[in-house]
Curated annotation (Swiss-Prot):
The gene is SAP10. GO terms for molecular function: DNA binding; zinc ion binding. May be involved in environmental stress response. The keyword Repeat does not apply. Zn(2+) 1 binds at residues 10, 14, 26, 29. A zinc finger (AN1-type) spans 65-111. Zn(2+) 2 binds at residues 71, 74, 92, 95. This is Zinc finger A20 and AN1 domain-containing stress-associated protein 10. GO terms for biological process: cellular response to cold; cellular response to heat; cellular response to salt stress; response to manganese ion; response to metal ion; response to nickel cation; response to zinc ion.
């Protein structure tokens, strides 16, 4: 007598092995046969939601292509080692310094603004003379 777990050729003809538990079908053919015979297991979207809320014809959102990360001066691929400058561009290791790529960002002014916001202005009261 044949065990229930003994592998037999699939009756679906797919070339795989089936079991008696699955009516001599492999797992793939068994899943297909179960879905064909019982419509309750099939996934169908609910019609109530689609009737109450009409579908809107919104324009398809196009995914923007991934920008390749290249140096702003020599156009060499920088990958993960790219350096983003305060001027907003990406640079390689040799062009990352502001002097190398003629950076238009004003570092002195940004430093002055940072100090002005961080340090309070301290003034002594005016001295009165007799």
């Amino acid at each position: 007598m044949v065990n229930e777990t003994e592998a037999l050729p699939c009756e679906g003809g797919c070339g795989l092995y089936g079991t008696r538990v699955n009516n001599n079908l492999c797992s793939l053919c068994y899943k297909k046969s179960v879905l064909q015979h019982s419509p309750a297991l099939r996934f169908e979207p609910e019609t109530e939601q689609s009737q109450c809320c009409p579908p809107t014809n919104s324009p398809a959102v196009e995914e923007e292509p991934v920008k390749k990360r290249r140096c702003g001066i020599c156009k060499r691929k920088v990958g993960m080692l790219g350096f983003k400058c305060r001027c907003g561009h990406m640079f390689c290791g040799s062009h990352r310094y502001p002097e190398e790529h003629s950076c238009p960002f004003d570092y002195k002014q940004s430093g002055r603004l940072a100090l002005a916001t961080q340090l309070p202005l301290i003034r002594a009261d005016k001295l009165q003379r007799f």
